[in-house]
């Protein structure tokens, strides 16, 4: 019976065949232990000299790391195994012998591992992080489908920058200038006026010359937009969504979280509603904590966000930022025009902002005024402004950065471990 490692529980006491790679091995005179992996998981294969042919035992003793095999064996329950099972090996067929595999069980430096990222992905830790990433993506689609959202794919090549920044990757679009997308938000707003509630999931590109553990040059975002939804309801969608994906990871990635040594008690507390603090109150709090480098009108840096997050055991919304700090498309508060109806969701444990969202400007005159204030070319945004000309309604949305979210939930120390092939300031290889 051919099966995969994650399905062996269905075959207790039976002989199965698994296609696998040797992640590690150890042996004594009469027994060999093979740590096998097949992409679905890891299992220990036990080869007892007295119970197999001599040539099979010799293969087990001499097999090299990452050699590919077909292994047959009896599935046995084993409480000591994270999987709960082991394989009593009866035969081994070598598919391809690996020689001089560069990533050995010893410690390696970060640059070495990044140069060999195409191989580092095979390690138990990286495998666990990728499985958690996959579960977050799966749960994202499940959540938004259940909530009646329509998946929409905005363009990656654009003729304008959604936030009017200079941190763009420029390219030529035949005879025109074009840019790699920083966000699909403006297009998602258009889609929301057609379909009501929409979301996108795709790559974004920001030419930020940053080397922090929170930043990537290419990263993936989930960007929902909702017609007839105002600020508070937008926050409720965000907290319900984040709580949903955390609980899904807890349910479906127990082995992976255990592999990573993640303290799941901290994740078990992540349930809606999340606490809220206004920007004004956050400034007061930071000053009380001794941060003399921050004044009203300044943006928060990583130390400020971490200090605020440490006061809560859940993600916290920082709301109502100064208008001057935020992009042109954010709706001003009803009672004061110096702040906007926006929120950043700050993850616990020092992982920083994972969501930025706001109610969007829905008045055409105000939008045109904001474009002028930000020095943006109104012609480039003509189509976007027209959304306010034909049945404009209050609408809101947000963007969640996938890699930061994966880092927080998995406990990864750096976002470079949360995407298969990270693009960093000085890294475009492999």
From Swiss-Prot:
* Main localization of the protein described in the UniProt heading: cytoplasm
Which NCBIfam families does the record cross-reference, listed alphabetically? asnS, PRK03932.1, PRK05159.1
- Record's subunit section: Homodimer.
Q: Name one GO biological process term.
A: asparaginyl-tRNA aminoacylation
Organism name: Bacillus velezensis (strain DSM 23117 / BGSC 10A6 / LMG 26770 / FZB42) (Bacillus amyloliquefaciens subsp. plantarum)
Q: Where in the cell is it found?
A: Cytoplasm
Report the PROSITE patterns cross-referenced here.
AA_TRNA_LIGASE_II
GO molecular function annotations of the record:
asparagine-tRNA ligase activity; ATP binding; catalytic activity, acting on a protein; nucleic acid binding; transferase activity
Q: What is this protein called?
A: Asparagine--tRNA ligase
Q: Which family does it belong to?
A: Belongs to the class-II aminoacyl-tRNA synthetase family.
């Amino acid at each position: 019976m051919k099966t995969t490692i994650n399905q062996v529980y269905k075959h207790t006491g039976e002989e199965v065949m698994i296609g696998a790679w040797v992640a590690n091995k150890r042996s004594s005179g009469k027994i060999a232990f093979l740590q096998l992996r097949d992409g679905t998981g890891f299992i220990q294969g036990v080869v007892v000299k007295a119970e197999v042919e001599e040539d099979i035992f010799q293969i087990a003793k001499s097999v090299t790391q990452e050699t590919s095999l077909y292994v047959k064996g009896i599935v046995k329950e084993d409480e000591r195994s994270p999987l709960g099972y082991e394989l009593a090996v009866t035969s081994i067929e070598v598919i391809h012998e690996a020689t001089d595999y560069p990533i050995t069980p010893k410690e390696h430096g970060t640059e070495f591992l990044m140069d060999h990222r195409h191989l580092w992905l095979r390690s138990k830790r990286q495998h666990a992080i990728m499985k958690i990433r996959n579960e977050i993506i799966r749960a994202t689609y499940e959540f938004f489908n259940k909530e009646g959202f329509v998946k929409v794919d905005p363009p990656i090549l654009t003729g304008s920058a959604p936030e009017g920044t200079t941190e763009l990757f420029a390219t030529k679009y035949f005879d025109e200038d074009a840019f790699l997308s920083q966000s699909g938000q403006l297009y998602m707003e258009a889609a929301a006026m057609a379909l009501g509630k929409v979301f996108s999931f795709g790559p974004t590109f920001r030419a930020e010359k940053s080397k922090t553990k929170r930043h990537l040059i290419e990263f993936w975002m989930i960007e929902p937009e909702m017609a007839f939804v105002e600020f508070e309801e937008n926050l409720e969608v965000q907290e319900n969504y984040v709580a949903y994906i955390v609980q899904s990871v807890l349910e479906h990635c127990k082995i992976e979280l255990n592999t990573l040594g993640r303290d799941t008690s901290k994740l078990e507390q992540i349930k809606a509603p999340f606490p809220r603090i206004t920007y004004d109150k956050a400034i007061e709090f930071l000053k009380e904590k001794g941060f003399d480098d921050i004044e009203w009108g300044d943006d928060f840096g990583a130390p400020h966000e971490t200090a605020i997050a440490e006061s809560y055991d859940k993600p916290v919304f920082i709301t109502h930022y100064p208008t001057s700090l935020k992009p042109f498309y954010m709706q001003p508060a009803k009672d004061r025009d110096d702040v906007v109806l926006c929120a950043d969701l700050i993850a616990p444990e020092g992982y920083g902002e994972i969501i930025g969202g706001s109610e969007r400007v829905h008045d055409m005159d105000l939008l045109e005024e904001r474009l002028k204030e930000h020095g943006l070319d109104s012609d480039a945004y003509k189509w976007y402004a027209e959304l306010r000309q034909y049945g404009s309604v209050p609408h809101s949305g947000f963007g969640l950065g996938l890699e930061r979210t994966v880092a927080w939930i998995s406990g990864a120390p750096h976002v470079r471990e949360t995407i298969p092939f990270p693009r960093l300031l000085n890294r475009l290889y492999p």
